[in-house]
Amino acid sequence: MGEYIVTKTLNNNVVVCTNNDQEVILIGKGIGFNKKEGMTLNDQTITIEKIYKLESEQQKAHYKSLVEIADDNVLQVIIDSLNFISNTAMNVDSKQLVVSLTDHIIFAYKRLKQNQVISNPFVMETMQLYSDAYHIAKQVIDQLNAALDVHFPEDEIGFIALHIASNTEDLSMHEMTLINNVIKKGIDIIESDLVTTVDKESLQYQRFIRHVQFLIRRLRRKEYIHAQDDFVSMIKNHYPICYNTAYKILTMIQKQFDVNISESEIIYLTLHIHHFEERINQS
């Protein structure tokens, strides 16, 4: 039997307690109703939906401040969303996600009510790179829309997908945003050099962004690939425009991530860009 001493009631659904000298946050419907500091709760008489042990004092303070500015209905919907993500996403760490996602949804909801929408320029890149997280995020947004009687734009699906993906991938939110930005700029360079519009539903696009994502990961781990000299010469001579485009994109990646770029990397990216060129010639 787990016993918890109430140290603070944040609202009807959230209380801060101590358990064996460890401060925890208990979440459950009505769990905080009429609960006062010093009261003892036990898991045999109350329904606990989630127990969060936030590691740092900064996390604890931030979460408490968020809960205090959100009404109970919004907070319950966020709790339901966290439970859904925890039960659906693979390898998700709830205690890491609880603060960031609570923060994001509270302020996204406030902005929406004030008709302030932040555009997300990386929706397509996020959908392609993190398709599982994007699918889960779409279901979360559908649930939020229904429960709060609002209509979050598709931009928010992308934002929430990044929160989920950053929790399950070996990348931070900042790193994923950088990768999305590099991919978007890379596509801009391709469209300019090849005088075309890239079909973001195409297999060529999907292969390109996957290649760039894994290329950046490899380079940051200092894992390099090597192509034979005659193969390098052949590709440079056969596809000079695509080679030049690949060089521009990899130079941008080199500056953005402070990594070393080899001739072989340029060659393999050239081949991916050539697939776009082939599609243009076929149309």
From Swiss-Prot:
One Pfam family this sequence matches: PRD
Lineage: superkingdom: Bacteria
Biological processes per GO annotation: positive regulation of DNA-templated transcription
InterPro entries: BglG_antiterminators (IPR050661), CAT_RNA-bd_dom (IPR004341), CAT_RNA-bd_dom_sf (IPR036650), PRD (IPR011608), PRD_sf (IPR036634), Transcrpt_antitermin_CS (IPR001550)
A molecular function (GO) term: RNA binding
UniProtKB keywords: Repeat
Keyword Repeat: yes
Ranges of residues in domain PRD: 69-173, 174-283
UniProt KW Repeat keyword: yes
Protein family per UniProt: Belongs to the transcriptional antiterminator BglG family. GlcT subfamily.
Protein name (database record): Protein GlcT
Source organism: Staphylococcus aureus (strain MRSA252)
Source lineage: Bacteria, Bacillati, Bacillota, Bacilli, Bacillales
